[in-house]
């Protein structure tokens, strides 16, 4: 199969992966409206072409939390990453490290912190949920710090799991789910050999290390369902600061008021995110929410964005809308499932090339030169009408 874009990796991953795993990453919440709008809204952002600008000295390098990045991209935290390729977190981290960008390890990774961190040169980032078991949270923070993790990504948009209807149909949950998963594994031999047999143990390493026993998929579902904490509040940031003194990024911001609160409570960064359309269906796409948030807090806090990014043009669009950097999630997981570390490395090369084309043809020689001036102005506005926030009159 010819691979020329992230969409090719998605098609390849669908053939390789058992359906329960493919649809777990590919699907969203409820009717998946927000999942679709994430991609569609971003694709509607029109770039402003500029020519004859002498673009021979173009650079994608940037700095974030005192870390030098080869381009404004980090790999997002993705749960169960190690089920998509043999020791998947290790392979993805190696690809990010070689490219000179951060890798973020999920709380619910297959490979534990202690397995991934020693395999790469640059410090990785660590993602944490707010859970009822504060002992686990403290344990995870202490282990992340001991392993040299540089930045904490604190996910706040999951006080309760979203309703993901695809999971019941695909075998991730629902009647006879375990039996259906075994059958799917048996009928997908490439995955069964690479991951099913040779990628063991298939437990959640960070949780197993704390509980002192293996955690299989059923344990994962049950433990998380019992531990998500709806009492989460801004005060939890103060508690986390008792155990974490490095940069802290709040992931799951969609409203300017929440962004201002993040500044007020001492966060170092935010991620404008709707969890990839996997939590509350019907909320704004990240592309549509980002401009107002940037207007509210740009310069006061680092702004990252995710959800809907599929190529290098999308990275440039997000930065033009107000982000300092982006997190890449689904796109890299498709590549990982297709070709492991080499797939992720190739995807990052593709994104880099696409960014260079977009920057060359919009006249931006550096990341700092990408702004709303890089977008086509319509009707006297700096943003396309399709992305203008709804007013009460519009909603009516």
UniProtKB/Swiss-Prot annotation:
Keyword RNA-binding: no
Source domain of life: Bacteria
Cofactor entry: FMN
Keyword Oxidoreductase: yes
Residues binding FMN: 106, 127, 155, 251, 306-330
CDD domains cross-referenced by the UniProt entry: alpha_hydroxyacid_oxid_FMN
Protein's UniProt name: L-lactate dehydrogenase
Source species taxonomy: Bacteria, Pseudomonadati, Pseudomonadota, Gammaproteobacteria, Enterobacterales
């Amino acid at each position: 199969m010819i691979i020329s874009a992230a969409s090719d990796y998605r098609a390849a991953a669908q053939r390789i992966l058992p359906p329960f795993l493919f649809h777990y990453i590919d699907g969203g919440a409820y009717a998946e409206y927000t999942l679709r709008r994430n991609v569609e809204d971003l694709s509607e952002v029109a770039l402003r072409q500029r020519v004859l600008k002498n673009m021979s000295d173009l650079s994608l390098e940037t700095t974030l939390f005192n870390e030098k990045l080869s381009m404004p991209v980090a790999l997002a935290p993705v749960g169960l990453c190690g089920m998509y390729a043999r020791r998947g977190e290790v392979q993805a981290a190696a690809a990010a490290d070689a490219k000179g960008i951060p890798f973020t390890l999920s709380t619910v990774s297959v490979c534990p912190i202690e397995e991934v961190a020693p395999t790469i040169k640059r410090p990785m980032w660590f993602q944490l949920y707010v859970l009822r078991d504060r002992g686990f949270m403290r344990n995870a923070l202490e282990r992340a710090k001991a392993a040299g993790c540089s930045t904490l990504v604190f996910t706040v948009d999951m006080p309760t799991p979203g309703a993901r209807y695809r999971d019941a149909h695909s075998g991730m949950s629902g009647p006879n789910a375990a039996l259906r998963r075994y059958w799917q594994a048996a009928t997908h031999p490439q995955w069964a050999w690479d991951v099913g047999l040779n990628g063991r143990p298939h437990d959640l390493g960070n949780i197993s290390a704390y509980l002192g026993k293996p955690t299989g998929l059923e344990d994962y579902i049950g433990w998380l369902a019992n531990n998500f904490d709806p009492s989460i509040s801004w005060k939890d940031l103060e508690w986390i600061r008792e155990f974490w003194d490095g940069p802290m990024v709040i992931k799951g911001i969609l409203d300017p008021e929440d962004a201002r609160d993040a500044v007020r409570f001492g966060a170092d960064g935010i991620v404008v995110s709707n969890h990839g359309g996997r939590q509350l269906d019907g909320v704004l796409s990240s592309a549509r929410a980002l401009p107002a948030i940037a207007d509210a807090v740009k310069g006061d806090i680092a702004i990252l964005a995710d959800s809907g990014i599929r190529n290098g043009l999308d990275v440039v669009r997000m930065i033009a809308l107000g982000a300092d950097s982006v997190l890449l999630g689904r796109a890299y997981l498709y590549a990982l499932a297709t070709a492991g570390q080499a797939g992720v490395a190739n995807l990052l090369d593709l994104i880099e090339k696409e960014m260079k084309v977009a920057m060359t043809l919009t006249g931006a020689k550096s990341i700092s030169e990408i702004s709303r001036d890089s977008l086509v102005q319509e009707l006297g506005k700096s943003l396309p009408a399709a992305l203008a926030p709804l007013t009460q009159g519009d909603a009516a």
